[in-house]
């Protein structure tokens, strides 16, 4: 007789609710977990135990029915199920190497994924998880690999967690002689792919590539793989979290410690006249390719507009040529007054409006609902984005 299948979700980043297990058919029915007051309940991640190696187990996913109690506010009605339903689920038998399932089968509001592994347990998730522990291990590994990198903390979160950050520079140039580069991911906790993009950026930056060495020698780079550390750790979605999410919090009085700390450091670069490139990494809507969000040009002045467009041209020229393909649009989407009432408090917009005349500040949205939206695909995007930063800055006047 087959062992009973069980579901565990008592570990970092896990999230699941409404679990029902049919031991006869080996079908696990579930919904994403998460407190809707702490963001969109579309992220799911849990461990299945009691599997007979080689048997077929099915995951039957329904969208969350959770709502918030704020009249007219976010999630006054349930979130569309498509946000929780990638075409392919992600799984791992060791919690380190993540693979896609075959395409799920959608029937109305239910998506069914099939899992078959040669193991007695398996982790399953919306996408490849990237937890606070992953971020900490990565920045520590990069610091140990290279004496040009220093693993540090951006701050401590409101719940007391460390927010890992990597600081990178090489050589004897003074700070005043260096370009300033700020890269951050995961202001929305459910967008796990953005952290893998960030990791790819960091891996390239500290590689033996001559262009990477040039960037280290000519710039000071700050790198934060997870901004919304608390919601990432607790398996909450983060997007539209109350009182506002991290990417609606770049105001004169931010709520979140991570935003307070990032804003302070970015403001320092601005005051020094060297906030050259600011990149905020996200994942988009289910049907979107990779693309940049920009602040509408009417809110900007030259040379910022021309420099922004040049950077996008260089990044598109690299990312769109990645093999296997990562679909990317060369037409950015715009934000501004018509997009969201808090548009001024989006991080990339805040940096654009408060930055130096030459600042390039962008949000990159990397496709997640695609066959090549894997840890390898995401990291390739990050590496090519970093190479585009180097190419762009090499065109800029050398800082005296």
Task: Put a short name on every predicted segment.
Residues 286-289, 370-374:
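Short active-site-adjacent structural elements
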Residues 371-400:
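His/Asp/Glu-rich mid-to-C-terminal helical/loop segments that flank catalytic regions of hydrolases
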Residues 69-70, 125, 132-135, 191-193, ...:
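Short helix/loop capping segments that flank catalytic or ligand/cofactor-binding pockets
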Residues 103-159:
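Extended acidic/polar, glycine-enriched regions
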Residues 1-118, 122:
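Extreme N-terminal flexible tails
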Residues 150-170, 175-337, 341-357, 361-365:
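Active-site/substrate-binding loop(s) of hydrolase catalytic cores
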Residues 68-75, 134-137, 175-177:
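A short, polar/proline- and glycine-enriched secondary-structure boundary/capping micro-motif
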